[in-house]
Amino acid sequence: MTPLYFLNKYLKDYKVVRIGISGLSPLTHYRFGQCIKEAVGDKNVLLIASGDLSHRLKEDGPYGYKEEGPLFDHDIITAWKNSDFMRFLTFDPIFTEAAAECGLRSFQIMAGALDQKKIKPHYYSYEGPFGVGYGICGFEICGEDQTRDIGNQYKKKMQEEVKKIKEHEDDYVRLARTTIEHYVKEKVEIIPEVTKEMKRRAGVFVSIHEEGRLRGCIGTFMPVQDNIALEIVHNAISACSEDPRFDPITEEELDNLIISVDVLGEIEPVEDISTLDPHIYGIIVSHGSKRGLLLPSLEGVDTVTD
């Protein structure tokens, strides 16, 4: 609540609306900021986007050092100075997690609240003496600027990237995408065409990402359907509608989704972890009645120890 300490020095009669952030996507936070803008109208309002920057600037800091820490803070300060709000939306989530930041979503909401506004930045300071980054920058509204519809520009850019990816999808991914799109729109399971490659049985995982973030992932260690095609259909529906970590995918999200399908090979025992390569092999770990699986080539998993 540091900003309120200074605010109270100059203002005595004001009301505060405290808003929490979420684990939702950058664009969702931006849209929320636009809702704030609409609700505020022409009222006299000060929006404080509060939050620390990286917590990993020094070895002797509370969270240690990661090279992503100083890089994140540098990018944020540069974005502030240049009023580059698009940068708030385009950080790689693996990168920001490594940087251990906590202010980015507040900045995304602020950017949405200033949508299509002509702004002038007032950069004041940055420091990180204790291993945590602290910065101060204000933005003055100087009029309207229709070219600063950052949210729409970001959405268009994201959908263009997804379109390019879709052009190179294989039969497995196309089946998963068709299944998801049909189920989300119609709530009906499709009857798949079973190609020669999909006639055999195998475990399958279907993963869904949106804006670089996991949006759903469900799979089977061992086959439970008559063929791979049916395995994909059932797991695609579960991934988009039954993953307990996420809300069901909506029709508005369909154009933003990146989908992957992993068809599991034969399970083999591991005699020596030195034979493992996380970029080639997945791994199943069992303990008592519990069992977990890591797919190969996961973001943020670069070594066997990871």
List each language-model region with its residue ranges.
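Basic nucleic-acid-binding interfaces
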Residues: K155-D306
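A glycine-rich, aromatic-flanked flexible loop/lid motif
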Residues: S50-G51, K81-F85, I150-G151, G203-L214
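Active-site beta-strand/loop microenvironment that shapes enzyme catalytic pockets
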Residues: G20-F72, I208-I228
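Short, acidic Gly/Pro/Ser/Thr-rich loop/turn segments
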Residues: H55-R56, E144-Q146, E268, G292
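Short, electropositive, low-hydrophobicity segments enriched in small/polar residues
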Residues: H55-R56, F107, C137, T220-P223, ...
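Short gly/pro-enriched beta-turn/loop segments at secondary-structure junctions
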Residues: L11-Y14, V40-N44, S50-G51, V132, ...
